[in-house]
């Protein structure tokens, strides 16, 4: 799903053009040299490898999907000399190794899948050190209110969607969850240039679940993703 990758000349054209999101977040990263970083919902590790080039001390990827963890490990098998990067088959809520206080946490594309968004934000707060940073990327609602997707319903074809917050409501929730210096640094609308079917992922993708006017098949406004940067109080 995430990529692209080039492995010994083999071009893996992933469903997501993940370098586009990387370009959006890169300029808002703190100086991460020497930092301990958690990449929540890391998938196959694409963003972890991008972060690795900025010389952190440690990156811990977490993902509950076994296939993504296996993909992560398959890629890492070609880079055995890299000891600063590892992946764990768990969520941020399940991670309980209290000896690590992370300097930076990335949670991208996770919050709207959470059954309990407050619990997810609290887990980030407990993992990051005081004054440490989080980068939270999530779909946001351009309607006057949150979008609450009911059980067995979909949003842009996606299942297991909970609440899609307005930017103001998410800002308020982050404040009440113990974060400060909250900034919305980027808004972008997903399109079929960034997410699409390829020979490596030949199932249905973004364009199959959206209308010509940009709305989703379910009638929601165009899919907007927002990037929040904040620090723990």
Regions found by a protein language model. Give the residues of each.
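Short, glycine-/aromatic-enriched active-site segment of Class I SAM-dependent methyltransferases
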Residues: 139-161
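Conserved catalytic loop of SAM-dependent methyltransferase domains
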Residues: 180-208
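Conserved class I S-adenosyl-L-methionine
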Residues: 35-43
């Amino acid at each position: 799903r995430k990529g692209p990758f080039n492995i010994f000349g083999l071009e893996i054209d992933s469903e997501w053009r993940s370098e586009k999101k990387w370009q959006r977040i890169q300029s808002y990263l703190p100086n991460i040299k020497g930092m301990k970083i958690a990449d929540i919902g890391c998938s196959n590790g694409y963003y972890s490898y991008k972060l690795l080039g900025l010389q952190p001390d440690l990156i811990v990827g977490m993902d509950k999907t076994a296939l993504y963890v296996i993909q992560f490990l398959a890629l890492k098998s070609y880079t055995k000399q890299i000891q600063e990067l590892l992946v764990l088959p768990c969520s941020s809520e399940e991670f309980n190794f209290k000896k690590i206080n992370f300097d930076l946490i990335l949670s991208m594309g996770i919050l709207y899948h959470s059954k309990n968004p407050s619990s997810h934000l609290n887990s980030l707060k407990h993992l990051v050190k005081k004054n440490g940073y989080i980068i939270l990327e999530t779909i946001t609602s351009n309607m006057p209110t949150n979008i609450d997707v009911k059980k067995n319903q979909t949003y842009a074809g996606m299942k297991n969607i909970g609440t899609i917050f307005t930017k103001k409501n998410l800002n308020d929730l982050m404040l009440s969850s113990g974060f400060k210096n909250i900034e919305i640094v980027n808004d972008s609308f997903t399109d079929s240039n960034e997410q699409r079917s390829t020979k490596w992922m030949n199932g249905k993708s973004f364009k199959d679940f959206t209308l010509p006017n940009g709305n989703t098949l379910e009638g929601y406004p165009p899919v907007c993703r927002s990037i929040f940067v904040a620090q723990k109080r």
